[in-house]
């Protein structure tokens, strides 16, 4: 039925495009003054709309009304992320489950509490009976994020109390969703490969007593095999993506929806929709696309060759012609992104094992040479750094994870932070979020049908 109307609709909407664009454009002068476009202050900082105990991001400090750059730090419940990751690397343990507990409960668990939480998570990973067959296999999607979003909304129908927003019920829903996400993603990708790419269908169920990272790799691979080092690296990826403060776009969407009193599934589905955007979670795939252009067109051992090509990309003469170098710069971090620092530190060994050492080195060259080029064009010496997206795509690639799953895997980590922020919003903020928009429309009168002129677009 959709195909039957596509041609007619394309002709109709195509004839109106120019007129519509003209009607929707707003003169830049109206944004001057106190309008916080993009919820940003004039200095680029985010508009303060609330307080949180869940996560915090530090990339600068204010002095005499000016931003002063500082090394980047990311805190989960007041504990520095780097400290958490380093502790688990030293102990050679998996840490994502502990991070999820910390974010949800507000404190680090004892061994007994973590073991109990892991037991609960083991049971929560199994999707409802028939869910994969009825919701994923019957309605395959080329885009795994869309499949994930739809699946979350479908889970509403499997919950006996989906609209109950008492804290114990939201917490129960949160634990289930954290457990469900890897299975939904792995199954959705397997079905996508089968229906759209013509590959064999392999559906693997999660296994108890394995970590989230281990289960994900096991479910994603036809032969279910993985190494401990691969699983530990993926576990670190989950830890560094689990939370990033209440102001990032997807978490803010989750909070805004939660402020309306809506159900958990609607709030989390909205967050997934936000994360899908290329300006948010989809940036890691854009970095890999950019990297392929660079790799195909430069001599990796010649800095001049690399700089020349990066300049062409900035001039919109190469790459995707957007004029951007993806993975460089961040809204908060100035001198360093602690997540990128961790990835560079711990992914190097995997790059050597997997035969990606040259790619890793070239990506570092893009970072080192690209930042000065951007600063030069901006006529600014303000510090810039590579963000986590600069290296996350290559890490996923080294782990054999396809680009279709980059952003969904990001969501599989961030679900812990979304749920914690949702609970905090429900507990502490009893007002619906309601910002204002200033109307700049020219006032007019209703014109009777017989007195109207024919639209210029027609």
Where are the regions a protein language model picked out?
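Non-transmembrane, aqueous-exposed alpha-helical and coiled segments at domain scale
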Residues: 1-458
